[in-house]
Design a protein with these regions (language model features):
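Conserved alpha/beta enzyme-core scaffold
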Residues: 1-252
Length: 252
């Protein structure tokens, strides 16, 4: 964003960005940056209504083929990572998902080191080796994104109560973003349910509450037994501190 007047026709691709990118704010007439989002957040939808964001229609499972078939070859993959460990690996942090594929297919791989990125242990390629990196940026250690806690309305509570009745001991959970999933998580944490498992796209703060209340053990899971499997996490420092080096969680 600081180099806005030096650059032209720069395509930026991201997904579920919770806040307007600085590149968009620095270029409100889209003369320099073209912002694209695969899975539009509330912030991206508002930008789209102002013609400041392109929506890329892509269902999640299509992501690998989208890149492997070179439909959208990237020149640069810029990834935020944790500091390098003694073996030369940078942990990719809270958003694994398609990140290894971005690195595999980009012409240039740049990592920005941030000491606040938690070490997220996983099941497959949760780290990138220094030999696979072209450039390293020593950043200013920006804080992790904090998702504000949304107020839970009476309607959310009523829906959550209905959902809770359908959950049995040993059930496997997936929760998304918003007040209603948080309400479900809060009620589960206060319930007497046992041995729940987690296999979710997104990990949020309410999973921490359920785990610490003893509701989540994963003992009855057949896949990733005794682990909470997820592909990205977004919440507050309570969640990020919980994830840091935690073998009870597995990111994919």
């Amino acid at each position: 964003a600081q180099r806005v007047d030096e650059l032209e026709n720069v395509n930026i691709r991201t997904t579920t960005c919770p806040f307007p990118p600085k590149t968009v704010l620095a270029d409100p007439e889209r003369k320099h940056f073209i912002y694209n989002d695969y899975h539009m957040s509330a912030a991206s939808r508002k930008l789209h209504d102002k013609d400041l964001c392109n929506y890329v229609p892509l269902t999640y499972h299509e992501g690998p083929s989208f890149y492997e078939r070179d439909y959208v070859a990237a020149d640069v993959a810029l990834i935020k990572v944790a500091p390098m460990d003694k073996h030369g690996f940078f942990n990719l942090g809270t958003a694994l998902s398609l990140t290894p594929l971005f690195c595999d297919t980009a012409k240039t791989v740049i990592v920005e080191v941030n000491e606040n990125v938690p070490i997220c242990l996983g099941g497959c390629r949760e780290s990138i080796h220094i030999s696979e990196v072209d450039y390293i940026v020593e950043g200013d250690n920006q804080p992790m994104i904090q998702l504000p806690e949304l107020p839970i309305a009476d309607t959310d509570k009523k829906i959550a109560a209905i959902v809770l009745e359908e959950i049995e001991d040993g059930a496997c959970l997936q929760l998304g973003i918003g007040a209603m999933p948080n309400a479900v998580g809060a009620m589960i944490a206060q319930s007497d349910l046992k041995d729940l498992g987690v296999h979710t796209e997104m990990l949020v703060d309410s999973f921490v509450d359920m785990y610490e209340a003893g509701r989540i053990t994963g003992r009855r899971k057949q896949l990733d037994k005794c682990k909470m499997a997820y592909t990205f996490a977004m919440g507050t420092n309570k969640l990020y501190n919980f994830l840091d080096g935690n073998p009870a969680c597995a990111i994919y």
